[in-house]
C-alpha cells in the first residue's frame, strides 16, 4: 500500500513538472522571423498593391491636365450623292483637317496641372500610410500566431497535467487514501482543460488565416520577436515627430494645396479664353463625266468672354471653396487621430511592460505555491481541489505572461506606426522598394502611347 501511495505522489509531482517551464523549449529551432514576414507582406499584400495601382492612376491625371496645353487635331471625311431636276447625279467628297490650340484659358489649365501634381504627392503619402498600416498589421498577425501557438502549447501541458491528476486521484482511491469526490473534481478539471485546448487550437487557426491574408503565405514555425527599436522618449516627442513626418498628416496638407489650386481653376472660368483655329480641306466632285476639285485653308484667333452661365460657374466656385475649407478641417481631424493613436500606444506599451514584470514574478510565486500545495496534500493538509486550483493559477499566469510579451511587441510597433516611422526603408527591410516617382516621370509629359510603362 505504501508503494502505491508513493507512486501516486510521484505522478502528482510529474504533473507539476509539466507546468513548471514557462513556454515552449522547442521554439529555439524556429525558422520564420518577424523581419521575414514584413518583407513578404511588403511584396505580397493585395491591398498594398492596390494602393500602388491607385498612385499610378493618379499619375495619369497630370498628363490629362497637361493635355489642355497641347493642340487638338481632328480629321474629317464626308461623301454624299445627290441629284436635282436640272443636273445629273453628283458625288461630292470632302476631306479635311482642323487644329485647335488654346492660347489663354484664364489660367485654368495651369491651376489644374498644379492641382493634379499636388494630388499625386498626396496620393504618395497615402500610399506610405497604407504601407505603414500594412506592416503594422503584419506585426500584429505574426505576434498573434506566435502568442496563440504558445497558449495552445501551454493548454496541452495543462491537459497532460490534469491527466496525471486524474490518474493520481484514482490511485489514491484504490488504496483508500482518496475519495470519489477527488476523482470527480480531477475529471471535471480535465474536461475544462480539454475544452480550453480545443478553443486555443481554433484561435490558432483563425490567427493563421489572418496571417495568410496580410502576409501572403501560411505561417511556418515562428521565432520570438523583440520590441521595436528607436522609439521616442516621451509622448510629446512622438507627436512632434509625427507632425513632421506622419504620411497621413502630410497627405491632408497636400490635399489642402490641391483644393486651393482647384479654387483658382474654377475662378479662371470667369476670365476670357483665347484660342487659335487652323483648318484645311479638299473638295472633290464627280458629275457624270465631269470632275472638279477645290482646296480651302483658314487660320484664325477667337476670343470668348463669359457673361452669364446660369449660375453654374458661381456655384462651382463656391463649392470649391467649401471643399478647401473641408480639406483644412481634415488636417485637424487627422492630427487628432494621430495624437490619440500615440497616447493609446504609449499607454499600452507601458502597461504591457509592467505586466511582463509582474507576471514573471507571478510565475515564480505560482510555481512555489503549487509545489507547496502538493507537499501539503501528501500529508493531508490540502485537498485535491487545492492542487487543481494551484495548477490552474500557474497556467493562468503563464498565459498572462505570453499575452503581455505579445502586447509589448505589438504596442511598440503601434507607437512607431503612430509617429509615421514604420516604412520599409525606416525598418531597414532588405527588399526592392516600390518607387512611385519612376512611373510618374514616365507618364507625366507623355504626348501619346497606349501602353503603360510596364508594357500593358
From Swiss-Prot:
GO terms (BP aspect): response to antibiotic
Protein's name according to its UniProt entry: Outer membrane efflux protein BepC
Coiled-coil intervals, chain numbering: 312-341
Subcellular location as annotated: Cell outer membrane
Subunit structure, as described in the record: Probably part of a tripartite efflux pump, which is composed of an outer membrane efflux protein, an inner membrane protein and a protein that expands the periplasmic space. Could form a tripartite pump with BepD and BepE or with BepF and BepG.
Molecular function in Gene Ontology: efflux transmembrane transporter activity; porin activity
Family: Belongs to the outer membrane factor (OMF) (TC 1.B.17) family.
Protein's job: Involved in the efflux of toxic and relatively hydrophobic compounds. Influences survival inside the host.
